[in-house]
Amino acid sequence: MRVKHKKWAVPLMEAHPEMMTMDPASFKGRWQERFAKPQPLQVEVGMGKGQFIIGMAKAHPEINFIGLEIESTVAAIALKNALPEQLPNLTLVRGDGAGLDTYFEDGSIDRLYLNFSDPWPKTRHEKRRLTYKTFLANYQQVVKPGGGLEFKTDNQGLFEYSLTSLNNFGMIFDGVWLNLHESPENEGNVETEYEQRFASLGQPIYKLKAHFPVN
């Protein structure tokens, strides 16, 4: 998500270290210290303005959540949205999804979420897609054996590409939905900002769940 840079973004994030960190590598191996108590850990890569990760933290107090966003202004907007909620099981990160192995210990994450990622439609940009094989290898390193990944998008091309990429990587599919909002899987679904927008226009939302095999 790209928005115009706001001068207040970095100062706001610096003013709330209890909720936001811009130095995620310093917490490698000790993320649970940022929460009220140790619990299973789930991470959203590319949280945007935070609607999904905040909603998940509210709906699942038994799980600790981390929202990761590379764009400083967008991350700061997510912080503004999260602060009034005062959720003890949520922390936010200004960081790059390509650096998960520098932020998290091997096998420390229970589940990853990729929601409405940039499709990077040009072939020469394939390596930037969050479901490209090098990203999947990075995810496999930090996710627990047998741990899962959930992916939602409105982009049919990216979804089809991701199905192929995950399959070629050897991931095991737990579910594939070509119209999430018209399926039973939509019960309890926490929507993102983009998801609400595209669904209101009648655009089908695609979703997959998959996990890494246990060697």
Curated annotation (Swiss-Prot):
GO CC term (a single one): tRNA methyltransferase complex
Catalytic machinery residues: D118
Stretches for region Interaction with RNA: 124-129
Pathway(s) of this molecule: tRNA modification; N(7)-methylguanine-tRNA biosynthesis
InterPro entries: SAM-dependent_MTases_sf (IPR029063), tRNA_(Gua-N-7)_MeTrfase_Trmb (IPR003358), tRNA_methyltr_TrmB_bact (IPR055361)
Function: Catalyzes the formation of N(7)-methylguanine at position 46 (m7G46) in tRNA.
Protein's recorded name: tRNA (guanine-N(7)-)-methyltransferase
Gene: trmB
